[in-house]
UniProtKB/Swiss-Prot annotation:
The keyword Methyltransferase does not apply. The modification Phosphothreonine is found at residue 500. Residues 205-214, 245-254, 289-305, 365-375, 398-407, 932-956, 1407-1423 have a biased composition (Acidic residues). Residues 36-76, 156-499, 550-584, 589-608, 770-819, 863-964, 1082-1115, 1197-1216, 1261-1315, 1334-1482, 1503-1658 are annotated as: Disordered. Interacts with SIR4. Involved in the clustering of telomeres at the nuclear periphery, forming discrete subcompartments that accumulate a complex of histone-binding silencing factors like SIR4. Required for SIR4-mediated anchoring and partitioning of plasmids. Its main location: nucleus. GO terms for cellular component: chromosome, telomeric region; nuclear periphery. Keywords: Nucleus, Phosphoprotein, Transcription, Transcription regulation. This is Silent chromatin protein ESC1. Residues 262-286, 568-577, 800-812, 879-905, 1082-1096, 1197-1207, 1463-1479, 1648-1658 have a biased composition (Polar residues). Residues 36-54, 335-352, 386-397, 425-435, 442-461, 471-482, 869-878, 918-931, 1097-1115, 1261-1272, 1335-1366, 1507-1537, 1550-1564, 1575-1591 have a biased composition (Basic and acidic residues).
Length: 1658
């Protein structure tokens, strides 16, 4: 209670409620003048004064304040009085609150105190319960195990109180219980004991409580209160006993415990009966146990005190659970073999006779360290002293009586339990004396050992003085107990005899038998455990641990000797009395005591007769301790149990085999265990190691090392693929780079340029150009390239279609600035961002010039093998082969052994196209190539035009000239090029493109470096110009469609007028499909090569010099325009940086190369096809308008339009210029001031957005086949469409065929008059022109039929064009796009004009002129061409500049539907348009677009696509005239508020699928006339300029046609009432006459009302 009082002392202080004086203000009067002022601030005042008078009081309740304030407010007249009262009340309230708070705190503290007490009480109870639990276990070793395991935490907590466990446990009657438990007990006995152990637990709890009370009383006397809750008396006595010697302490404890002996004896008797019945090892031991039980409390207290003292001296923290276990074992029942082992140990250590020290103490001391042994001995000595004194204090008779009573009680249980022991009883009787002798010897040795242990224990040296006496007493008591027990109860004697005899006999018989040793050890352990008190049990555990740790068998030998000697008198007899099974069960006790076979060996030397003999036998049997160690029970009690018994320090002792051996359990079968004390660490590979990444490379894609473009040498990577990719890119660039001179190409082929294509894994595609000027031998390069390409092409090809956009996006941005130019010195890298549609194409300008020649049969030399094939022997001897197959990793390969020649092998497989249906469609279109490749004559063009495969949606666009020896560009057929389409299920497209490239400019490296990399950023488009600043020989313009965001993220984009660049740029628009892009790029490359070859076919040798020459040098404008499906929206193209490192990002370079190669092939394919289909696509001139609009969307360059103009004029001058359109690629070669400027306009449009177009294109193909069967109606349809674009379209038609979807035609102009290629182009163009004129004539004859064929659902491929103004135009012009569309489609009357030599003029005139209603009625039939032309003109206008909606005042946004895909006007018309759609895949979608979306530079640009398309048609003059007229007409349309965005949809190719271009045109005829006039006027000068460039004749014709068209357009616009109606026109080629008729009938008034300017039709 002192604690409680102490705890209440501060509480009392708190409870001192004194009047607060600190802030108390004494008022002189209730009415204080100051109060008045204070009351002014009533609320604040109340708070202030409340605080003022508050002294550490809780906050006032608001209610009180409110009451006070209300009270004051109610008595305002008597403020001062109320204030005083309020203050008083507030003070009282604060006082009350304070008192409450104090009380609350006191209550809380009391509750906490009570709770702590309860917790402590529960802890003690738990301790007792655990002790009882473990001591009450049927098996001592199990008890030990449980103790060790479950009591670990508890033990540690108890160990924190070092002295308490000793005191409490010593005072506990555990020694008796241990003595009792020392008797071997069967499982049945254990159960009985467990039943009785509950009583013992209760007894222990009572004792503990009593001891706790004593401890509380004597808390001051004791260094630390025992954890056991003793009564105050017990605790006081224990504290006194601590000061008293161990004997006196034991006596006092005995006296104290004797008070409770009655109860204890009852429990102890039960326990002893159980223990005697269980142990039945000897009445002597049971007597000792009874004595211990009688003195259990005293012994516990004394032993605990002694142990506490010993612990104080030895500083051993004893686990209460451990102590409790032996105590509880003693009290509960020594049933558990843990008792046997523990009590045996404890008894040996704690035995009253001093035998206690014999076993456990000896074990601990000898085994572990002398200190620990001495400590254990001291504990045992203390325990022995206490126990001994207790036993002496308790008369032996009393103890014997108690034991007898317990034995008599336990005999019943033992009889049942010892049914098996009956056999042993005889032996026990016979060997009783022997066991006693052995016990005596063991006792003597134990005494000696205990003495040694005590002597070893410096802390308990004083006790060691008493030890001999104690030992004597212990021996005597043990002997007495042993003999007396044997004499007292015959049954117990019989049991002891039985146990002792069989144990001894077995041990003797098993001197050499390990099992006997184990049995002996078990019995010894059981004896030790049973005899040892709780503290002794713990000490035994400690000793075991020490022994195990020390691994010294001497100590366990001593322990066993002591234990066995002790057992000889007590436990020994019990052990002997135990059956072999019991002894086996006791084996873990041996183990627990740390007595292993080795230990037993050591024990053997120390053990007395029987025990020693047993130990000797065991040791003899176990010559090698390891063998015994190997034989270890599965139980893991050994060290852990021991450690649990011992100090925590001992717990962590070595993992010795001894420990493992000591873990042997009696019941647990022995298992051979390696004698090595340490755990064997088996290091095995991870389960996944064998299947690690190395092994899972097949299952998992190999990690691709990321090559950062920021690396000093991004090409340095662990992968050899990079080098191979370098070679691949090198060869590719060598084949593709037209911008380089032959020397440059040679230099590139020599290895100057190296590229590294990386897979989608994130490897940056790197284009590396070594600075080496050394030219690699053809063979070496071919080999290197072959190897490199073969290895890398597969991955690259697989990824090129997918990766390039993503690869080029972000990394390229930084790589532009970061990559060292030294790696890219050969070629300036332009920062090209990848399109989401994977349409990024950067075409290197190295060898494209020479490699663009495709469609040559020389390419046949390049086998159309898988991408693995890389080397092709070119005619020039150069081994160049580009193998592109997305299927295989080696699909794309390019090697240029010879600088002059490069072969491109392009192979596309269906698997490659699985990702993109549009690609598949395109490839299906490519199937036409086979036929096309086979045919060589120009008739092949006609055939392709007439015989497009229906299955090929855009095959007409891709229809490569069937073996045409003449280049579609007008170039003489490249000798080394071949574009072949393989009709393989796997291989949809395979094209071998080889072009002899004279790479003679070995200074190309520096030249390229000198070449200015100019990037023109235009709305989602990037144009790159590589121009040799030194010689300007090579000018490469690369236009890449990029995301605007990417543009913003990329390097600075200096504003540059598109007009500056379009002159030199090649628009290359690609479809969303990667393969299509690659095909387009490849075709573009091939086209570029073809153009360069066509321009310098014979000048290959001259190219090196001619290109070196400023005049003869060919500026290669490679305008690669990457268009994504998202970019289709018409937006003003932002001028891109005039200069940017062309391939600052090698990724872009590679992507450009690969994609460019593929697309060049595709473009070449479609280019040739378009040449063949060009006439049929003349109907697609309307699509050209859409394409022109796409051009506006994708390029701002008016140069393209100027080039187109010049091309058209030059094409009109068939001697100078030739334009070919393939799959949206128009290649023009024209002389430009003696400079070979090659412009490749490739405009693959994005797919996906218009899948309808593919179907429409298929229908177009079918219709084209029909048209191919019936050319006349086709020609008529062509005439109708070629009114606007026939020549232009014939010039550019194939271009727009590729341009249909969104493909920008590629114009290749060769301006060198001396250039043979240019002459060839002119020749070809002239042929094409003648052919187109012939087609025009045919179209005159069978215009309606052709229109019926022209109106094909293939045109419906762009469903956006839903209504055509004229059914004969086979185009569905939806009113949604234009409220008013002035379709200046010339009537057949105008077609007659077109029949004139100036078909272009007629087309332009028709475009510009508006037919009469009848004419319009007919023109609507012919509408597709005129509409295409007009749309083309609008595109020209848009290229020139954005046509603001104000520019089209006559075309306000129509109230009518603007549905891109819907057919608001009439599905029948659309159907007819689709049905009548000619084979030309071009589909023109007219959508109302905001002027912002339409890039317009009206004065500067004419839609390059229009011009290109016109260039495609041989009638360049018509193109020019038409374009001029369109421009003038567009000028008329400029007033329209809504700019007209027209996309040319190539029905054939999904990539060419036209993206719906909303065109907002006001229906007002006059208004349209005006804008059309303005537009025409603006376009006229540009077209005139172009025509002037082309030829004055063409200019004159164009001017004439322009004037005619202007007047006609005005008429048409006047006649057409748009009434603010927007029309969407989908014009398809090959419209059927019937459908045309239907459209006439259905739309004649509409068309009349909808008479749109041809520019509007654009």
């Amino acid at each position: 209670m002192s604690k409680k009082k102490e705890t209440f002392t501060p509480r009392a202080n708190k409870l001192k409620l004194t009047t607060p004086r600190r802030k108390l203000k004494i008022l002189s009067s209730l009415l204080d003048a100051d109060e008045d002022s204070k009351m002014k601030d009533q609320h604040g005042y109340s708070r202030v004064h409340n605080d003022k008078y508050r002294v550490a009081k809780p906050t006032q309740h608001s209610t009180l304040h409110e009451s006070i304030s209300s009270r004051r407010s109610s008595h305002i007249h008597n403020k001062s009085l109320h204030e005083d009262s309020a203050r008083a009340l507030s003070w009282v309230d604060s006082l009350i609150n304070r008192g409450k708070s104090i009380l609350t705190t006191l209550e809380k503290e009391d509750a906490l105190f009570e709770r702590s007490l309860e917790e402590e009480r529960q802890r003690f109870q738990l301790h007792d319960s655990l002790m009882n639990k473990y001591t009450g276990n049927s098996k001592s070793h199990q008890r030990l195990i449980d103790l060790r395991k479950s009591q670990y935490g508890t033990d540690t907590s108890f160990q924190n109180n070092d002295e308490i466990p000793l005191d409490s446990f010593i005072s506990s009657p555990l020694p008796d219980a241990e003595d009792e438990s020392s008797s071997n007990i069967d499982s049945d006995k254990d159960e009985d004991l467990e039943g009785k152990q509950s009583l013992i637990k209760d007894f222990d709890l009572e004792n503990d409580e009593y001891e706790l009370s004593e401890e509380e009383k004597n808390s001051d006397g004791q260094s630390s209160p025992s954890i056991m809750i003793l009564s105050d008396e017990e605790y006081a006595e224990e504290g006194a006993l601590q000061d008293v010697s161990n004997d006196e302490y034991a006596e006092e404890e005995g006296q104290v415990e004797r008070k409770n002996i009655g109860q204890e004896q009852a429990n102890v008797e039960n326990a002893t009966q159980i223990s005697s019945s269980d142990s039945s090892e000897g009445q002597n031991y049971s007597e000792g146990v009874e004595m211990e039980l009688e003195d259990d409390i005293d012994v516990e207290s004394d032993a605990e005190k002694d142990e506490s003292q010993g612990a104080e001296g030895t500083e051993h923290s004893v686990d209460f659970s451990k102590y409790m276990q032996p105590r509880t074992d003693n009290t509960k029942i020594p049933v558990i073999e843990k008792y046997e082992s523990d009590e045996h140990k404890v008894h040996q250590r704690y035995s009253e006779d001093g035998a206690f020290d014999f076993g456990s103490v000896n074990i601990s001391v000898d085994d572990e360290s002398e200190d620990e042994e001495s400590q254990a001995e001291s504990y045992s000595a203390n325990a022995e002293n206490v126990y001994h004194h207790n036993e002496h204090e308790l008369d032996d008779k009393e103890l014997i009586e108690d034991i007898e009573s317990s034995d008599s009680e336990s005999q019943s249980a033992q009889e049942s339990e010892q049914g098996s022991e009956d056999d042993f009883e005889y032996k026990m009787k016979n060997e009783k004396s022997t066991s006693e002798e052995t016990e005596n010897t063991s006792e003597s040795r134990d005494q000696g050992f205990a003495k040694d242990a005590y002597t070893k224990n410096k802390v308990e040296q004083q006790e060691n003085d008493e030890e001999p006496e104690k030992d004597d007493i212990i021996r005597s008591s043990l002997d007495k107990n042993f003999h007396g027990n044997n004499n007292k109860s015959e049954y117990s004697e019989n049991v002891l005899e039985n146990e002792t005899d069989p144990a001894i006999v077995e041990r003797e018989n098993q001197i050499n038998d390990v099992e006997g040793y184990d049995v002996t050890g078990k019995s010894v352990e059981s004896d030790l455990h049973e005899h040892s008190p709780d503290n002794l049990y713990d000490l035994a555990a400690r000793a075991m641990l020490q022994f195990q740790q020390s691994r010294n068998s001497n100590c366990p030998q001593k322990e066993e000797q002591v234990s066995e000697s002790y057992l000889g008198h007590s436990n020994g007899s019990n052990l002997s009395g135990r059956s072999l099974d019991e002894s086996e069960e006791q084996i873990p006790l041996k183990d627990f005591t740390g007595e292993n076979n080795n230990n037993l060996k050591t024990d053997r030397g120390d053990l007395s007769s029987s025990v020693e003999i047993e130990v000797e036998k065991v040791s003899e049997k176990k010559l090698d301790g390891s063998t015994e160690k190997e034989l270890v029970p599965l139980s893991t009690d050994t060290t852990i149990n021991n450690s649990s018994l011992g100090n925590e320090d001992s717990i962590y002792y070595s993992l010795d085999d001894a420990d493992a051996i000591s873990e042997n359990l009696t019941d647990v079968p022995l298992m051979e265990i390696k004698t090595t004390p340490k755990y064997e660490v088996v290091i095995s590979e991870s389960v996944y190691s064998s299947t690690s990444y190395e092994d899972n490379t097949v299952a998992m894609p190999p990690q691709v090392e990321y090559t950062s473009p920021f690396m000093n040498d991004p090409f340095n990577s662990l992968n050899d693929d990079y080098e191979k990719k370098h070679d691949l890119l090198k060869s590719t660039l060598a084949a593709l780079a037209p911008a380089f001179t032959k020397k440059d190409a040679e230099f590139v082929e020599a290895g100057v340029t190296k590229s590294c294509l990386t897979s989608t894994s994130g490897h940056t595609n790197i284009f590396h150009t070594s600075k080496e000027t050394k030219q690699v031998s053809d063979l070496d390069e071919s080999t290197e390239n072959v190897t490199f390409e073969n290895e890398n092409t597969g991955d690259e090809n697989k990824n090129q279609s997918k990766n390039f956009p993503g690869v080029a996006n972000s990394t390229d941005k930084s790589t532009e600035d970061n990559t060292d130019e030294k790696y890219f010195s050969a070629i300036n890298y332009t920062n090209v961002t990848g399109d989401s549609s994977c349409e990024d194409i950067i075409e290197t300008a190295s060898n494209v010039e020479e490699n663009l020649r495709y469609c040559e049969k020389d390419m046949n030399e390049a086998e159309m093998s898988s991408g693995d094939e890389c080397v092709k022997q070119n005619d020039d001897g150069s081994k160049t082969q580009i193998s592109f197959s997305t299927d295989s990793p080696d699909n794309f390969q390019e090697s240029n052994d010879n600088t002059e020649f490069s072969s491109t092998k392009y192979k596309v497989r269906n698997s490659d196209l699985e990702d993109d249906e549009s690609l598949k469609k395109e490839l299906t279109k490519a199937e036409v190539v086979d036929k096309l490749d086979e045919e060589e004559s120009e008739d092949s063009y006609e055939q392709d035009y007439a015989d497009p495969e229906p299955g090929n949606d855009e095959g007409s666009n891709e229809n490569i000239v069937k073996g045409t020896k003449k280049d579609t560009l007008g170039i003489v057929e490249p000798e080394n090029e071949k574009v072949n389409k393989v009709h393989e299920e796997e291989t949809l497209f395979e094209a071998n493109v080889s072009s002899s490239v004279n790479v003679q400019n070995k200074d190309m490296h520096t030249d390229v470096i000198n070449q200015e990399a100019q990037a023109n950023y235009e709305a989602g488009e990037r144009k790159y110009y590589i121009q040799n600043t030194d010689t300007e020989e090579a000018h490469i313009s690369i236009i890449e469609r990029i995301d605007e965001n990417a543009i913003g993220n990329n390097m600075e984009i200096p504003e540059r007028s598109c007009v500056e660049k379009t002159h030199n740029e090649v628009l290359f628009e690609r479809r969303a499909t990667t393969i299509e892009n690659t095909k387009a790029l490849e075709n573009n490359t091939n086209m570029h090569d073809q153009v360069s070859q066509a321009c310098s076919d014979s000048d290959r040798d001259q190219d090196s010099t001619a290109e070196k020459n400023v005049e003869g040098s060919a500026k290669h404008n490679l305008d690669i325009r990457v268009s994504s499906s998202e970019i289709e929206s018409v937006e003003p193209l932002k001028p891109e940086s005039d200069r940017s490192n062309i391939f600052s990002s090698p990724i872009r370079v590679i992507g450009a190369v690969v994609k460019g190669v593929g697309k060049v092939v595709d473009v070449a394919e479609s280019f040739v096809k378009k040449i063949d289909v060009m006439d049929s696509e003349s109907d697609d001139n309307v699509d050209i308008g859409d394409y022109n609009q796409d051009i506006f969307n994708k390029s701002n360059s008016t140069d393209a339009s100027v080039n187109m103009k010049s091309v058209s004029s030059k094409e009109r001058d068939s001697d100078e210029d030739e334009a070919v359109i393939l799959g949206g690629v128009t290649a023009e070669a024209h002389n430009d001031n003696g400079n070979n400027s090659r412009v490749i306009n490739i405009d693959p449009t994005t797919n996906g957005a218009y899948e309808e177009d593919s179907e429409v294109f298929r229908q177009q193909v079918k219709d084209k086949e029909n048209l191919h069967k019936s050319e006349e109606p086709l020609v008529e349809g062509l005439q109708s469409e070629q009114h606007f674009e026939k020549k232009d379209h014939s010039e550019n038609e194939e271009e727009f065929d590729t341009i249909y979807g969104d493909i920008t035609s590629a114009n290749i102009h060769s301006n060198a008059p001396d250039d043979i290629k240019r002459q060839q182009l002119l020749k070809n163009l002239s042929d094409l022109e003648n052919y187109s004129q012939r087609l025009i004539e045919d179209s005159r004859r069978g215009k309606n039929q052709e229109e019926s064929d022209e109106v094909n659902t293939s045109r419906e491929r762009d469903l956006t064009f839903e209504k055509s103004v004229n059914e004969k135009y086979a185009g569905a012009i939806e009113e949604d796009t234009f409220s008013e569309l002035d379709i200046s489609i010339q009537h057949p009357e105008h077609e007659e004009d077109l029949d004139l030599s100036n078909n272009q003029e007629r087309s332009i005139e028709e475009l510009n002129s508006e037919p009469e209603e009848a004419e319009l009625y007919e023109l609507e039939i012919e509408g597709p061409t005129e509409t295409a032309a007009s749309s083309k003109m609008n595109d020209d206008e848009r290229q020139r500049g954005n046509i603001p909606s104000t520019d089209l005042p006559s075309d306000p946004p129509s109230d009518k539907e603007e549905v891109t895909d819907s057919y608001p006007y009439s599905n029948s018309e659309n159907i007819t348009a689709e049905k009548s759609a000619p084979t030309s895949p071009e589909v023109y979608e007219i959508f109302s677009d905001t002027p912002n979306e339409v890039p317009m530079e009206i004065n500067d640009e004419i839609p390059a696509t229009t011009l290109e398309k016109h260039d495609k048609t041989n009638v360049t003059s018509v193109l020019d005239d038409r374009s001029e007229h369109l421009s003038s007409h567009d000028v008329d349309n400029e007033p329209h508020d809504n700019s007209i965005n027209i996309k040319v949809n190539e029905g054939e190719e999904p990539e060419h699928q036209a993206v719906d271009i909303p065109v907002k045109v006001e229906v007002k005829e006059e208004q349209e006339e005006m804008p059309s006039k303005s537009v025409l006027e603006e376009q006229k000068p540009s077209m005139e300029l172009i025509n002037d460039k082309s030829s004055p004749e063409n200019n004159n014709d164009e001017e004439t046609n322009r004037e005619k068209d202007k007047t006609k357009a005005k008429k048409k616009s006047r006649k057409r009432n748009y009434n603010s109606r927007r029309r969407k026109r989908k014009i398809t080629e090959g419209s059927s006459a019937a459908s045309n008729t239907k459209r006439r009938r259905g739309h004649e008034p509409k068309s009349r009302g909808q008479n749109t300017h041809p520019s509007v039709d654009k």
